[in-house]
Curated annotation (Swiss-Prot):
It is found in: Mitochondrion inner membrane. Belongs to the peroxisomal membrane protein PXMP2/4 family. May be involved in cellular response to stress. Required to maintain mitochondrial DNA (mtDNA) integrity and stability. InterPro entries: Mpv17_PMP22. One of its GO terms (biological process) is ethanol metabolic process. The lineage of its organism: Eukaryota, Fungi, Dikarya, Ascomycota, Saccharomycotina. This is Protein SYM1. Keywords: Membrane, Mitochondrion, Mitochondrion inner membrane, Transmembrane, Transmembrane helix. The keyword Disulfide bond does not apply. GO terms for cellular component: cytoplasm; mitochondrial inner membrane; mitochondrion.
Length: 202
């Protein structure tokens, strides 16, 4: 565990890219395996990994920026959900559309159909987790903690991106499963943080 802590401290952006891309690809694999009747598409998983490589540095920089602000935790979470969450969802659907070779008009239509439902779903999950993340998790491990929760969220994003849903429709079953998984992830991350703190003190 000590070696991982040292790598996080020495190469925060590289480690963020590695963990984020890995978990985005795993999330896509899970989405294809359990929420799709189509044959597995390796290129779809590869696109998820490529997107994550571009997204991870921005997420790391954002967490560092928020972590440096002398604000209450609740204020940091509010800013995160008012600024980063809406922009990151739009960025996801736009970049994935470009990687899939869609036209700008098609990407715009996908955003109109899926953006608001996805954002509302995110607001049911991420604020509570980010309160835990900014309030308890040490700064060096916040990206990793978000990625652990993000494994479930990425599965949902992959599902949303692959299914061109009508406006106003939300995958209720998927959302409930995501919320349950997030609860489990929070417990697991809290346990890991306690272990990591013990190693750091040594």
């Amino acid at each position: 565990m000590n070696w991982y802590v040292r790598l996080l401290q020495k190469y925060p952006y590289r480690m963020a890219v590695t963990s984020t891309s890995s978990l985005f690809m795993i999330g896509d694999c899970v989405s294809q395996r359990y929420f799709s009747d189509k044959p597995y598409e390796p290129m779809r998983t590869a696109r998820a990994g490529i997107y994550a490589c571009a997204f991870a540095p921005a997420m790391t920089a954002w967490f560092r920026f928020l972590g440096q602000q002398q604000l209450p935790v609740i204020a940091k979470v509010a800013i995160d959900q008012a600024v980063f969450a809406p922009s990151s969802i739009g960025y996801y659907f736009s970049v994935m559309g470009l990687l899939e070779g869609k036209s700008p008009d098609t990407i715009w239509q996908s955003l109109k159909n899926q953006y608001w439902d996805t954002l509302k779903c995110g607001w049911m999950i991420w604020p509570a987790f980010q309160l835990f993340n900014f309030g308890i998790v040490p700064p060096n491990f916040r990206v990793l903690a978000s990625n652990c929760c993000g494994l479930v969220w990425n599965t949902f994003l992959a599902y949303q991106n692959a299914n061109k849903m009508e406006k106003g429709h939300v995958a209720d079953l998927v959302i409930e499963e995501v919320k349950e998984e997030v609860k489990e992830v929070k417990q697991e991350v809290l346990a890991e943080v306690k272990v990591i703190k013990g190693f750091v003190k040594q």
